[in-house]
Amino acid sequence: MAVAQCPASCGELIQGWILGSEKLVSCPVEWYSTVEVSSGSPLTDERPLSRAMVDRLLQYWQYPAHMSQDIRIDVQSTIPVAKGMASSTADIAATAIATAHYLGHQLDEQTLAQLCVSLEPTDSTVFRKLTLFDHNDASTQIGCESQPQLDLLVLESPETLRTADYHRIPRHSGLQAGAAALRRAWDKVQEACVSQNPYRLGEAATLSATASQLLLPKPDFDSLLALVEECDLYGVNVAHSGSVVGLMLDRTRHDVDYIKWMLAQKKLTVHWPQQHLLRMVTGGVELQ
């Protein structure tokens, strides 16, 4: 038996046209998918992409395909689905590492990323470091040295959008329009990591969130920006292919109850009725 876990993401710190194609930097948070791989017959309610990952690994290490029928995958996750929280990446990445360990192998981050994108567009939560990642083909993987400490008040909406559906939206002109802002945002992410400055990271995320309004607009976005300003928060980040929003803050410095009260006053809770206070964590899949 082997158990692994991978964090969710609160949308992306940045996503857009950077270095010649659409890329992203995920925002890993302390909400995990935990996957147990053991010997046994498959569960009836298993997640199809997790099974696809097991089959992909058997193929990768040249095991007979029928071995899959003796491998049980048990995914335990409460990460919201189809809202931009990287629930699917967490499931398949944790499945990959648990399966590899179960079969007596190891997977490095680069191989893991390659296997994940072979199944679907992938979040950079699969890397320990904050990483600029080409989520479609894994061709770019630029890691930042370290990351500032911060918390996120994650605003959850009832709205859902499958990543695959987002990728069908014509968005080339919107991506090009935001390219200059995203270049600045990527520079700020790197500066924030070097200087350990959460405000700089917030500036990067806010730039990217604003550019994303051309592609997948969030409701009452100006009210969100005003709240960030009024409460002196670090910034706001969004799911660029989902509905979730993150208010970037420090729970020891900022009054979270007051921020929640302000959300209600500005009627923002109409769009985001659920809130979760979470730490930003290091990414990567951990064996348990």
Task: Describe each PLM feature range.
Residues 74-76, 92-104, 187, 226-231:
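Long, contiguous secondary-structure blocks with strong helical propensity
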Residues 235-239:
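Short beta-strand
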Residues 83-109, 125:
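DPxDG-like acidic metal-binding loop motif
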Residues 56, 60, 98-105, 118:
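Active-site catalytic microenvironments for nucleophilic, acid-base chemistry
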Residues 1-83, 283:
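ATP-binding N-lobe of GHMP and related small-molecule kinases
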